[in-house]
Amino acid sequence: LVRLHILGDFPSVEYVAFWARMLNKFEFLNVYGYTARLSGTPIGDAILSLRSRRFMVRQSGQFNGDDMSALSFDDARSLPMVTAKKAIVCPTQIAKRDEYELAAKGIDTLTPNCGTCGLCWTTPKNIVFLTH
């Protein structure tokens, strides 16, 4: 499992094609991450065309569809998505709340870190981050 772009984003369509070649070459390679590249742009569309169970790259802030997006909780679209069960609040952040009670009293987190969770790279459901 490779987590892409902690400090950057996809710079080109050619770079997306590189990851397509790596996925074809290495059968057990899995990739996840986030991108600000939106659909309707060459890079965003290349990412969308590669998206699969082995290439779980979420688009940040674009909730046009029903899945594979990431959004901050302070965005007005996030609470309705969570309420309608179209999005999941990141389990490592469930107790970081403002006026909303997202966790049962006394629960700090549902899982201690991303490595013990895996929702970002195993579910197509939207993910909402309380702090991001």
Question: What residues fall within each predicted segment?
Answer:
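Class I S-adenosyl-L-methionine
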Residues: 1-132
